[in-house]
Amino acid sequence: GLDLKACFQYLDLLRRLMRRGTSVVLVTHHIHEIPPEVTRVVLLKKGRVVADGKKEDVMTGETLSALFGTRIHLVRSNGYYQALPGRKQV
């Protein structure tokens, strides 16, 4: 993992490349590293595609909970996503 400063520099570089029209294939387990400019997301589990489509359609708490096998509460802010522990149903 990168420290926060290095992570922000990395994201800034990715965003600049994408704004210039460069295609970027990003492979990560860290959803907070997905830049706002990303339009398509492919989710894999054990080498198989479990979801593929527009970022806003694929990046849901329900989809990520199924993918990672744990409840996830997904938060979106300024085009970025963050996974938080999901709440148990009462």
Predicted segments, located by residue:
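Conserved catalytic/dimer-interface elements of ABC ATPase nucleotide-binding domains
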Residues: V42
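Helix N-cap at the start of a conserved alpha-helix in ABC-type nucleotide-binding domains
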Residues: L4-A6
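ABC ATPase nucleotide-binding domains
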Residues: F68-V90
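A short, surface-exposed alpha-helical micro-motif characterized by mixed small hydrophobic
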Residues: I34-P36
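ABC ATPase "signature
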Residues: D52-G53
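Helical segment within the ABC ATPase nucleotide-binding domain
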Residues: F8-R20
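H-loop/switch region of ABC-family ATPase nucleotide-binding domains
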Residues: T28-H29
